[in-house]
């Protein structure tokens, strides 16, 4: 979608995030095809802190009308969470570069801990459950993250020696999103919503 996003992120020198600021200029196109005044509150406003324990956050969105096609028509996604996830993950990557930290470790340092659930984000969204640290460690182990970083360093060294022109990029992301129309309490104007939460037991019964 045609989004212009500006952000600021505050953190301590050791990488602990202390605050997040975001402003979005969102192109609606010639008219709002969604006819949904809760679209932004249900999506971008509340989920852009991602999977991270950020104590203070602010988000502002300006919706503008232009001579383009209606916003969101050509691109299917659930309630703008794609842009929200892209925003916070880019901020994390930039912070890692600024602090000289490994991007995976920076994420792990700031994940919401399992003992913090149910968790309410700085923007008022309630996360019912999760264990991000275990999921993250399993994912890194599955792809041999340490091995990939070692290979990346070797290629950089070989590039500097003029032995290769091929470098290795490593992309990381960890996101939390809402699904469906979102919790009822956040869709009061629209007058609709879906299940606020559910549990699955070991027999896979919802």
Say what each PLM segment does.
Residues 152-163, 167-190, 195:
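Flexible, glycine/threonine-enriched loop-and-boundary segments that flank and lead into catalytic domains
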Residues 2-91, 176-194:
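Glycine-rich loop/linker segments at domain edges
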Residues 73-151:
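N-terminal leader/propeptide and maturation segments of large enzyme subunits in energy/redox metabolism
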Residues 1, 18-23, 54, 104-112, ...:
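Beta-strand segments within the central parallel beta-sheet cores of soluble alpha/beta enzyme folds
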Residues 27, 98, 167-169:
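Short glycine/serine/threonine-biased micro-segments
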Residues 7-9, 199-202:
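Extended lipid/amphipathic-ligand handling interfaces
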Residues 44, 63, 145-163:
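Charged, low-complexity, helix-prone segments enriched in Lys/Glu/Asp/Gln
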Residues 205:
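Conserved small/polar residues in nucleotide/adenosyl-binding loops
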């Amino acid at each position: 979608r045609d989004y212009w996003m500006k952000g600021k992120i505050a953190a301590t020198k050791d990488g602990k995030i202390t605050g997040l600021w975001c402003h979005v200029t969102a192109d609606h196109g010639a008219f709002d095809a969604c006819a949904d005044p809760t679209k932004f509150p249900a999506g971008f406003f509340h989920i852009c802190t991602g999977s991270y324990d950020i104590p203070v956050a602010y988000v502002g969105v300006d919706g503008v009308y232009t001579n383009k096609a209606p916003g969101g028509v050509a691109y299917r996604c659930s309630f703008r969470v794609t842009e929200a996830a892209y925003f916070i993950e880019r901020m994390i990557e930039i912070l890692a570069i600024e602090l000289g930290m490994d991007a995976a470790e920076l994420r792990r340092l700031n994940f919401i801990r399992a003992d913090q659930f149910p968790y309410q984000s700085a923007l008022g969204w309630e996360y019912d459950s999760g264990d991000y640290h275990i999921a993250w460690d399993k994912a890194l182990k599955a792809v041999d993250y340490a091995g990939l970083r070692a290979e990346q360093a070797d290629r950089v060294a070989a590039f500097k020696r003029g032995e290769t022109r091929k470098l290795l990029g490593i992309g990381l992301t960890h996101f939390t999103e809402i699904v469906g129309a979102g919790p009822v309490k956040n869709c009061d104007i629209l007058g609709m919503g879906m299940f606020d939460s559910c549990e699955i037991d070991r027999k896979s019964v919802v």
